[in-house]
């Protein structure tokens, strides 16, 4: 049985919600803790790097846990739901920091940010791993992957377009207050989106997944030159995206300067976000039909 339009839409809604959360953290956590709360830039940057290195080991470990999971609700949905709820709570805590100073704020940021990464991985790994378990044919798997990636792009674009507008509208002159309300709004959307996804998309089979230890995974990676090339290119692409999303707001604030920098930043983000949505919803599916995976990549 092929996936219904309703199921594909529900899976896409899940992608929108989870990438809204990811984009909010990836694009604004440095600005929030450095410019709004006043932590040293070197410290914030160091914690971001440490968190990414930690993720490199945490992600495969999470994959092993998911593969070994057996529940009456399936292998993936319990992780998606529990990870979503936990991550939503941590996201709010990340952008609703208590009034602390100096070392106390540094400790708070370090713990909460790394915890955010752990809880996000709890739902992100099983979300994408669920695709083979909810589809029966290669065509269905391909279509669902396209839906997921397209909608994920929409989610991140929405954050780029509306975050600073909402921060100003909800917080007035206080960016600290504005970010707290935006985080709460995004967290609620996130939970609702994943609930819709898990309620509509259910596993159709319980095929056994051959598990490997984290050490075996890294050994297999480093013994495969083609896999290393792919992983290396992904690292470079994600590094470029991460740097751009984190630093573009500083370009507008300190290079454009003046009282109107937020308007300029919002205009830029709106145009870029709209272009991203258009590309993901129109251009990407068309190119996917015209080109092979390798050529498209």
Model-derived regions: residue spans:
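Membrane-embedded alpha-helical bundles of multi-pass transporters/translocases
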Residues: 1-297
